């Protein structure tokens, strides 16, 4: 690796974050959607067609590398300035869910390059896709329920944890070689989609080679090492921590781009265990590398890529602790940077070492520093095992999004797909389905006498819950139109060529949320 002074990479990471926070426009997602409009329909197979549009997007998407980057890659092009709860224009009284999947086009400010006509053309195309038409039918059917949020549903993208471990160890070329002789559109789509990350790496390498021509010596040393790294990964497996982080970032970038715009809450999983096989340096150096890794997850002026989670610690099936040196290096990176994203979570159990608690103490007793979310790994083992999770998968329990426990690479819990609003249901029970806000009749239910309100409330809750389940399943069926051949490579599809049928899903249990 290139030589650097202690703290030099930390300073670069902080400067890189400052540059990211200065970004006020996010246009890459629009370019991705426009590319889909221009290139889709070439193949009869929807799976292969989606893989081709992903590859074409990677070929033309504008790329850049800052003088403060030591790793190339960004997830900026997958997100829009849209997420309600961190959007300054968000008003609670106007929220009724995410009913219009093309509303994201309101979040791009027209200018000379992205004209109103250009935006309108892509939006009109998207409105006529199978995905949007199916989803619009669902929202229209249940509009009276969601109008004032007796419940709301979401068309969930993201919200799971890919398993990149095989790719990190063996490289993408071996994955392509392992699937090229298998039959089926799914295999052809995954083979094509995997080529996207190679194309992306080559494009970044060309940028670095151009920057190298007139770079000062210190930066030239960094650029030469970065170029050398991209000659190795993602084609072949990582040999050390630097290569592993770089490869992970590129895989993540393509995965998010495949589900643009706004694949919220994709999460890393047990990062300490993912990177432990590649730990080839000291803790201080690893910390500075992971500081750059953490900056990667922050998008523009409000860190728009929300609820991406990294978890540390935990146990194996015998109860032995799995903490390692990478655990503490990542903790140090989190503490030093104190960034708004990604979320830090930790798994605790009866054999968690004292050193782990001591390292957490600096988060808990330093004012103004983020604090990790705590998860009882012993309890998670028992609960998920009782719900059908295989024992061999339990050490891979990780958190996707805010607090949703999933199995890395095997579990699409579809979390945040539906939210039941019990206070609103109570209101409608008391009023006989009439809104206290507008006076409008929202539901065909009778007004409950106060002396019998509990029984009627439970009956109405069951009524709305059943309707919510039907609506939520409708949203999931709509999302099934959005093929994800690249992501499927890291969710079990690589082994069998399966892109998952939403009508015949045999994964782990799903759940709903309450508000």
Regions found by a protein language model. Name each.
Residues 2-193, 218-515:
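Conserved catalytic cores of very large enzyme subunits
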Residues 190, 201-204, 209:
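Low-complexity, highly charged intrinsically disordered N-terminal segments
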Residues 212-215:
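A conserved hydrophobic secondary-structure block that centers on an alpha-helix together
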Residues 195, 199-201:
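Alpha-helical bundle segments that constitute or directly flank the non-heme di-iron/ferroxidase center
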């Amino acid at each position: 690796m290139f030589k650097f002074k202690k703290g030099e990479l930390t300073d670069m990471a902080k400067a890189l974050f400052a540059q990211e926070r200065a970004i006020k426009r996010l246009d890459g997602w629009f370019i991705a959607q426009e590319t889909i409009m221009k290139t889709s329909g070439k193949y009869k197979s929807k799976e292969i067609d989606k893989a081709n549009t992903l590859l074409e997007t990677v070929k033309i998407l504008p790329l850049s590398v800052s003088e403060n980057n030591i790793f190339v890659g960004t997830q900026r092009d997958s997100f829009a300035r849209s997420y309600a709860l961190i959007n300054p224009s968000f008003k609670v009284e106007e929220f009724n869910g995410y009913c219009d999947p093309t509303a994201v086009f309101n979040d791009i400010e027209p200018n000379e390059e992205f004209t109103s006509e250009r935006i309108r053309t892509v939006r009109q195309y998207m409105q006529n896709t199978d995905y949007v038409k199916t989803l619009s039918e669902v929202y229209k059917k249940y509009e009276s329920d969601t109008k004032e949020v007796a419940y709301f549903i979401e068309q969930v993208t993201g919200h799971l944890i890919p398993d990149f471990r095989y790719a990190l160890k063996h490289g993408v070329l071996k994955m392509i070689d392992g699937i090229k002789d298998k039959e089926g559109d799914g295999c052809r789509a995954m083979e094509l989609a995997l080529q996207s990350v190679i194309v992306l790496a080559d494009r970044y390498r060309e940028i670095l080679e151009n920057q190298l021509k007139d770079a000062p010596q210190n930066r030239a040393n960094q650029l030469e090492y970065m170029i050398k790294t991209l000659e190795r990964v993602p084609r072949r497996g990582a040999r050390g921590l630097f290569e592993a982080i770089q490869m992970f970032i590129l895989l993540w970038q393509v995965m998010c781009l495949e589900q643009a715009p706004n694949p919220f809450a994709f999460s890393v999983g047990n990062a300490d265990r993912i990177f432990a096989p590649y730990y080839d340096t000291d803790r201080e150096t690893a910390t500075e590398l992971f500081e750059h890794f953490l900056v990667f997850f922050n998008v523009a002026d409000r860190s728009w890529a929300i609820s991406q989670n990294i978890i540390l610690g935990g146990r194996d099936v015998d109860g032995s602790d799995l903490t390692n040196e990478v655990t503490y290096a990542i903790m140090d990176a989190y503490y030093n940077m104190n960034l708004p994203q990604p979320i830090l979570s930790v798994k605790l159990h009866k054999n968690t070492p004292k050193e782990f608690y001591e390292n957490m103490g600096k988060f808990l007793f330093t004012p103004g520093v983020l604090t990790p979310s705590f998860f009882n790994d012993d309890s998670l083992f028992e609960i998920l095992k009782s719900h059908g999770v295989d024992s061999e998968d339990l050490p891979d329990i990780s958190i996707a999004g805010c607090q949703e426990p999933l199995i890395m690479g095997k579990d699409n819990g579809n979390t945040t797909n539906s939210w039941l609003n019990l206070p609103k249901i109570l209101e409608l029970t008391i009023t006989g389905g009439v809104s206290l806000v507008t006076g409008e009749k929202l539901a065909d239910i009778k007004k409950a006498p106060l002396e019998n309100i509990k029984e009627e409330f439970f009956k109405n809750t069951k009524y709305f819950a059943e309707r919510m389940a039907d609506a939520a399943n409708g949203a999931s069926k709509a999302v099934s139109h959005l093929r994800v051949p690249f992501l499927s490579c890291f969710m079990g599809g690589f082994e069998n060529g399966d892109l998952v049928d939403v009508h015949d899903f045999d994964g782990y249990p799903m759940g709903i949320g309450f508000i």
